[in-house]
Curated annotation (Swiss-Prot):
Leading EC class: lyase
Pfam families for the chain: DHQ_synthase, DHQS_C
Entry keyword annotation includes DNA repair: no
This protein's GO CC annotations: cytoplasm
Protein name: 3-dehydroquinate synthase
Pathway connected to this protein: Metabolic intermediate biosynthesis; chorismate biosynthesis; chorismate from D-erythrose 4-phosphate and phosphoenolpyruvate: step 2/7
Function in brief: Catalyzes the conversion of 3-deoxy-D-arabino-heptulosonate 7-phosphate (DAHP) to dehydroquinate (DHQ).
Gene behind this protein: aroB
Cofactor: Co(2+); Zn(2+); NAD(+)
Subcellular location: Cytoplasm
GO biological process: amino acid biosynthetic process; aromatic amino acid family biosynthetic process; chorismate biosynthetic process
Note describing how the cofactor binds: Binds 1 divalent metal cation per subunit. Can use either Co(2+) or Zn(2+).
Organism encoding this protein: Sulfolobus acidocaldarius (strain ATCC 33909 / DSM 639 / JCM 8929 / NBRC 15157 / NCIMB 11770)
């Protein structure tokens, strides 16, 4: 088991625990706790690690959990339970759960102590870390949200080991993202260790999760609130990926949409002359290596192009008709590029037809 702390803000450190018994950290929390957990989580697996007063609240999974009206229902739980700013909110579940629970923890009384316990690979390496919380509104994903850092991130690998391999694969797109634009060593590890990663070897999973968390937190530490143009690197694949999700009515798993989004955006970078020769091929190869989709033809749902382009035009990163995008220049490196939204829509239309 690996445990370390990162100082993201001057107010507090974030404890990070990765390993097969990471849940034991919860025994250190003696304060009153509201535990919001995915209905797919076996709560009996969690209870032995809980001490002191706590309230268990099963919640919805997936995009249903991220509806703004549902967030109001969860806030009422905190209000009715008499929770105050000295108490804790614990989110146990996938990315949609940590997104939603992080949002309510940050807004109730302007902030309660938050602990994220992601139970999927996607949650452990992306959605459950970094402090961005969001819910959906008006057909647009994550358009209402906050920046709010958790007190701790607990990545207990036993959750992953018990998941079907396909669920682990869905989260690998985000891991591969770090390798493509931030961390060549991680890319090389993934290239050489496919079998151990997909077979959920604990040592390989521990390395992949720890490395991904450190990659993301290093970016967040430098640009927590997206004011310096650094954190945008974490959006690689997400501009087109979110459009794909919207165009499918959010029926396509996030990881698969991001996988196709990374291929599209790597191609755009190449066509605009920002990436070295071979970057597109290396992107396609590593995603195919892990049996992730590389084109919309490989996705399970049809994409409504009009809806996808509408979502693209409503992207939060658009300023004065221009979108700031992270383009891979070589494996493990990237460049910030301003792309006119109409130009991007033209490229996206080619990619999504």
């Amino acid at each position: 088991m690996i445990r370390f702390s990162e100082s993201i803000t001057s107010q507090q450190d974030i404890d990070v625990v990765v390993g097969e018994n990471a849940l034991s950290y919860l025994r250190e929390i003696q304060n009153k706790k509201a535990i919001f957990y995915s209905s797919s989580v076996n709560i009996d697996f969690i209870k032995p690690h809980l001490e002191g007063e706590y309230t268990l609240v099963p919640i919805k999974d997936g995009e249903e959990a991220k509806d703004i009206q549902y967030s109001l229902e969860l806030l009422k739980v905190l209000f009715d339970g008499g929770f105050d700013r000295g108490d804790y909110v614990i989110a146990i579940g996938g990315g949609s759960v940590t997104d939603t629970v992080g949002f309510i923890a940050s807004t109730y009384m302007r902030g309660l102590n938050l602990i994220n316990v992601p139970t999927t690979l996607l949650g452990m390496v992306d959605a459950g870390i970094g402090g961005k919380n969001g819910v959906n509104f008006g057909r647009i994903k994550n358009i209402i949200g906050t920046f709010y850092q958790p007190r701790a991130i607990i990545a207990d690998l036993r959750f992953l080991i018990s998941l079907p391999s396909e669920e682990v694969r869905k989260g690998l797109a985000e891991v591969i993202k770090y390798g493509l634009v931030l961390d060549k060593e991680l890319y090389d590890f993934l290239a050489l260790n496919k079998n151990s990663v997909l077979s959920k070897d604990p040592e390989s999973l521990e390395y992949v999760v720890q490395r991904s968390i450190q990659d993301k937190l290093s970016v967040v530490k430098e640009d927590e609130r997206e004011t310096k143009g650094v954190r945008i690197v974490l959006n690689f694949g997400h501009t087109i990926g979110h459009a794909i999700e919207a165009g499918s009515g959010f029926s396509i798993p996030h990881g698969y949409a991001i996988s196709v989004g990374m291929v599209c955006e790597a191609k755009i970078a190449e066509e605009m002359g920002y990436s070295e020769e071979g970057v597109v091929e290396d992107t396609v190869w590593i995603l195919s290596h892990y049996n992730l989709p590389i084109s919309i033809d490989e996705l399970s749902s049809k994409i409504d192009l009009k809806e996808a382009l509408f979502a693209l035009s409503k992207d939060k990163k658009v300023r004065n008709g221009v979108l700031l995008m992270p383009f891979p220049t070589r494996i493990g490196d990237w460049k910030r590029v301003e792309v006119p939204i109409e130009t991007l829509k033209g490229f996206a239309e080619q990619c999504l037809k």
